UniProtKB/Swiss-Prot annotation:
GO-annotated cellular components: extracellular space
InterPro entries noted in UniProt: GnRH, Gonadoliberin
Modified residues (Pyrrolidone carboxylic acid): Q16
Free-text function comment from the UniProt entry: Stimulates the secretion of gonadotropins.
Descriptive protein name: Progonadoliberin-3
Source organism per UniProt: Oncorhynchus tshawytscha (Chinook salmon)
Cellular localization per UniProt: Secreted
PANTHER family: GONADOLIBERIN, PROGONADOLIBERIN-2
Family: Belongs to the GnRH family.
Recorded name of the encoding gene: gnrh3
Keyword match Cell inner membrane: no
Residue numbers bearing the Glycine amide modification: G25
Keywords carried by this UniProt record: Amidation, Cleavage on pair of basic residues, Hormone, Pyrrolidone carboxylic acid, Secreted, Signal
């Protein structure tokens, strides 16, 4: 019985890995995610390449980039 308990404890302690800023299960805390989004959304204006549009600028937000990546037809 002791050997089984020791084996289970060793398995749990060796397999448990938490990265800094992450909760168990690979989930981030909401506050840190919100801070990351705010840091990404600096409000800067990004110029598009000249092949796409001549001197046209548009403001890119993180969710706009994600939408364009997953739904390019829109």
């Amino acid at each position: 019985v002791r050997v089984v308990v020791l084996a289970l404890v060793a398995q749990v302690t060796l397999s448990q890995h938490w990265s800094y800023g992450w909760l168990p299960g690979g989930k981030r805390s909401v506050g840190e995610l919100e801070a990351t989004i705010k840091m990404m959304d600096t409000g800067g204006v990004v110029a598009l390449p000249e092949e796409t549009s001549a001197h046209v600028s548009e403001r890119l937000r993180p969710y706009d980039v994600i939408l364009k990546k997953w739904m390019p037809h829109k």
